[in-house]
């Protein structure tokens, strides 16, 4: 079997490595220090994104290293890479704790954008997906609950019930990824809409 990267992946990987060497590694300690300082003083600046992140995002977008995670089926969104093509880029980004955010490839935004790209209607895509793809907003994902082993999502107990033109969400979540980000504007919440359905068909997600 041939395990070499194809030309597209190799070109992106070389560009990514150059960006990491020129832009990310030199400021790694400074960025972490800025985050730690923000968490001091009773945590008042804990969730404030350091200004250098915004600068790096702009440079990554200009370099064509943006939204690398969405596969071919979601074009024109993303780079149209397969998982095998995206994997070595993840490996490179993973060398620095915060670098995936620079390229708009960090959770929970990646998963939420994929959900919106696949299942969202045109109104939802315009309101939420496009600003996420542009890096204008951040998002959150709420699945984990304190009373159950939530890594198995069939255990979750939060209910989502239709009430006229609205939905009522009743439950308790914690470890909600992205919820405290200062730019979080949309949350994807997992709950159960049919407790009597087969075990793996009870759940829904709501914006």
Named regions from a protein language model:
Residues 75, 144-148, 175-177:
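Short, solvent-exposed loop/turn elements at beta->coil junctions and helix N-caps
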Residues 135-144:
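A short, Trp-centered hydrophobic/proline-enriched beta-strand micro-motif
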Residues 1-107, 123-127, 131:
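Amphipathic, small/basic residue-rich leader segments at the start of a protein or domain
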Residues 148-156:
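Active-site-adjacent elements of ketosynthase-type condensing enzymes
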Residues 93, 118-121, 163-165, 192-196:
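Short loop segments at secondary-structure junctions
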Residues 158-161:
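A structural signal for short hydrophobic beta-strand segments in well-ordered beta-sheet cores
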Residues 166, 170-207:
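A short core secondary-structure module
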Residues 103-123, 152:
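N-terminal glycine-rich flavin-associated loop
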